């Protein structure tokens, strides 16, 4: 569960290291983003030779959260950090590699390309 101005680690190779959430997309009253939600982010920290630059405004999908999430089978899912993957308008990832584990809930939201690039799906 992440909200406005939360800092997220970036789990891909676009060159961004950290981003800050500007807006949680969805309904007008949506305050928090969970696994698989799309958010509008601003790049806060990036490497100089990367695809994206500091200050750029992009879309991202949440792939890991510290706040635990209950699954329908009763298991509880919790990660060590809050992380996202930068995406294009057509839901495809901007980078070519995904670092770290990602949640299986992304499959239900239609992010199969992110799951195929991920090292580990939990």
UniProtKB/Swiss-Prot annotation:
Q: Does the keyword Repeat apply?
A: no
Choose one Gene Ontology CC annotation of this protein and give it: cytosolic large ribosomal subunit
SMART domains, alphabetically? Ribosomal_L14
Concerning HAMAP family, the annotation shows: Ribosomal_uL14
- Give GO terms: molecular function aspect only: large ribosomal subunit rRNA binding; structural constituent of ribosome
Q: What does this protein do?
A: Binds to 23S rRNA. Forms part of two intersubunit bridges in the 70S ribosome.
Q: Which UniProt keywords apply?
A: Ribonucleoprotein, Ribosomal protein, RNA-binding, rRNA-binding
Q: Which organism is it from?
A: Mycoplasma pneumoniae (strain ATCC 29342 / M129 / Subtype 1) (Mycoplasmoides pneumoniae)
Q: Which InterPro entries match?
A: Ribosomal_uL14 (IPR000218), Ribosomal_uL14_bac-type (IPR005745), Ribosomal_uL14_CS (IPR019972), Ribosomal_uL14_sf (IPR036853)
Query: Looking at the keywords, is Transcription regulation present?
Result: no
Protein family according to the UniProt entry: Belongs to the universal ribosomal protein uL14 family.
Give the protein name, as stated in the record. Large ribosomal subunit protein uL14
This protein's gene is called: rplN
Under the subunit heading, UniProt states:
Part of the 50S ribosomal subunit. Forms a cluster with proteins L3 and L19. In the 70S ribosome, L14 and L19 interact and together make contacts with the 16S rRNA in bridges B5 and B8.
Q: Which GO terms describe its biological process?
A: translation
């Amino acid at each position: 569960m992440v909200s406005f101005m939360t800092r997220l680690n970036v789990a891909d190779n676009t060159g961004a290291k950290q981003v800050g959430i500007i807006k949680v997309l969805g309904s007008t009253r949506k305050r928090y983003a969970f696994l698989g939600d799309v958010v509008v982010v601003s790049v806060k920290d990036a490497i100089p030779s990367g695809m994206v630059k500091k200050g750029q405004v992009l879309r991202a999908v949440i792939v890991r959260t510290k706040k635990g999430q209950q699954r329908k089978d009763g298991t509880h899912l919790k990660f060590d950090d809050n992380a996202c993957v930068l995406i294009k308008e057509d839901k495809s990832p901007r980078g070519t590699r995904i670092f770290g584990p990602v949640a299986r809930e992304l499959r239900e939201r239609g992010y199969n390309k992110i799951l195929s690039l991920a090292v580990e799906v939990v």
